[in-house]
Amino acid sequence: MDFEQLLDKSLNKVREEIKTELSKSLDEAIKLLNEGHNKIVQEYSQRINELIVKTKEEIEGEKARLEVENKRTLLVEKEYWINKVYERVLGKIGEVVKTKEYKDAIENIISKEIKEIREEKVTIYCSPNDKLMIEKIVGNNKNVTVKTDEKMLGGIKIYFERSGLTRDFSLKLILDQVFDSMRGKISDMLFGGK
């Protein structure tokens, strides 16, 4: 073998070794690149998932807050309209006190209560509009005093002096009690059933 052949053979061998090393290096570089890429994709996927979860939680929290706020607003609005009904009914008391049924009811209450008092002194409080009617019902009973209360819309309050008890038959109290007991039914009538 001559020198050139030997040189060619050596060069070919070195070329093959370089090619093999380059191929290995290229494979290693591609592997490292793929691993880096996969790691980056995994990290960003994890971050994206965390952001999605966090955003969902924020949305659910905001949704819950808005639902509570909506319910609160609805309750305030319902209460407003229920109070409007109460005010309208309260305004109608002026018509009730003009009826014969009202006068008969007051007369029945007074006659029943006066029978029970015997010798005890009693003060009957009434609205200024009812004073004459109540004085007429009481007649000349010396144990009964009739006084007006500007705040009363109708009905009577009877104060027993000896015992210190007051029996309240005022229309406002009766209306309040009836209205409170019917609040649910009124709400159902205004806004539909539950």
From Swiss-Prot:
Its main location: membrane. One of its GO terms (molecular function) is proton-transporting ATP synthase activity, rotational mechanism. Disulfide bonds: none annotated. Keywords: ATP synthesis, Cell membrane, Hydrogen ion transport, Ion transport, Membrane, Transport. It is found in: Cell membrane. Belongs to the V-ATPase E subunit family. This is A-type ATP synthase subunit E. The lineage of its organism: Archaea, Thermoproteota, Thermoprotei, Sulfolobales, Sulfolobaceae. The gene is atpE.
